A protein has these predicted regions:
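A generic short alpha-helical patch detector that favors 3-5-residue windows
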Residues: 41, 66-70, 94, 116-119, ...
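Conserved phosphate-handling catalytic cores of large alpha/beta enzymes
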Residues: 124-153
């Protein structure tokens, strides 16, 4: 069998896998946590959503070509999840990168009665990107230590760090303070440390990301963005077969209870956010 024939057969198979993924329904699956992050492939970005049900099992929910910073793409992905059964009729925890467009999309599509946790790994990388090498370790350790504290104490510690950074590294200070409250959502919910370790970042997506790159390392040329999306879909579905339940899944009932206690957003406030 020639290489070109193998390539055509794989393209056809991966197209079917992508179609199957995009048509999945979750009406009978109680999705409690939704992780959303982007995977870059050169000039192409793919947004991936992975859900965790109330038993701690992971599910590949969907994907879209585009960046999380693209408001229309992010909202399209969220609307697609709603259409396929991840309805806005129950509060959830969304764990996302630092994208403002994605954050706004969650309120617009799912309403304000949801908890949003921003990825701490993204925040650390963003802040360190503004610092010289000799300052990175100290800042990283300070941030990681603050994340272990109660929400109010942790926020206060990072505000102190930002005040210190402001003197010489104002961009790092600004990056640190952006979205600071939502860095501590899981702390404010009073969740146990074991569960917080898994809910504080988008590692649930970043780990499959490394697996996708291993599977695609032999690809020397991406013909188009459609090829990237097909490969990502095929790789995710293959890895999903070996997904394990998240760490601390036995304590997810606590998250469920905390989410159900969240106040229902005022209708006027909700309309303003959607607008």
């Amino acid at each position: 069998m020639s290489k070109s024939q193998i390539s055509r057969e794989f393209a056809a198979a991966s197209e079917q896998q992508l179609k199957a993924l995009c048509e999945r329904r979750f009406d009978q699956t109680d999705i409690l946590v939704v992780y959303i992050d982007g995977i870059p492939f050169g000039d192409c970005h793919v947004i991936v959503a992975i859900g965790v049900d109330s038993d701690g099992c992971k599910h590949v929910l969907g994907l879209r070509e585009g960046s999380t910073e693209n408001g229309r793409v992010a909202t399209d992905l969220l609307n697609d999840l709603v259409e396929r059964g991840v309805k806005p009729d129950r509060p959830r925890l969304f764990v996302i990168d630092g994208s403002k467009a994605l954050r706004c999309g969650i309120d617009a599509v799912y309403g304000s009665r949801n908890a949003v946790q921003r990825c701490r790994n993204h925040k650390i990388r963003n802040v360190l990107g503004y610092l010289p090498e000799d300052q990175k370790d100290q800042a990283k350790c300070a941030m990681q230590a603050a994340f272990l504290l109660d929400a109010d104490k942790g926020i206060q510690k990072l505000k102190q760090l930002a005040k210190w950074l402001e003197q010489s590294y104002p961009s790092a200070a600004s990056s640190l303070l952006e979205g600071l409250e939502e860095m501590f959502t899981i702390n404010r919910l009073g969740l146990p440390k074991t569960l917080r370790r898994c809910l504080g970042s988008t590692n649930v997506i970043e780990s499959p990301n490394s697996g996708i790159r291993r599977r695609t390392r032999r690809v020397t040329r991406w013909r188009d963005h459609a090829m990237v999306v097909r490969w990502v879909a095929a790789s995710l579905l293959d890895m999903e077969k070996r997904f394990k339940r998240i760490m601390g899944y036995e304590q997810l009932w606590m998250l469920d209870a905390k989410l159900k206690d969240l106040p229902v957003a005022d209708a006027v406030d909700q309309e303003a956010k959607v607008a």
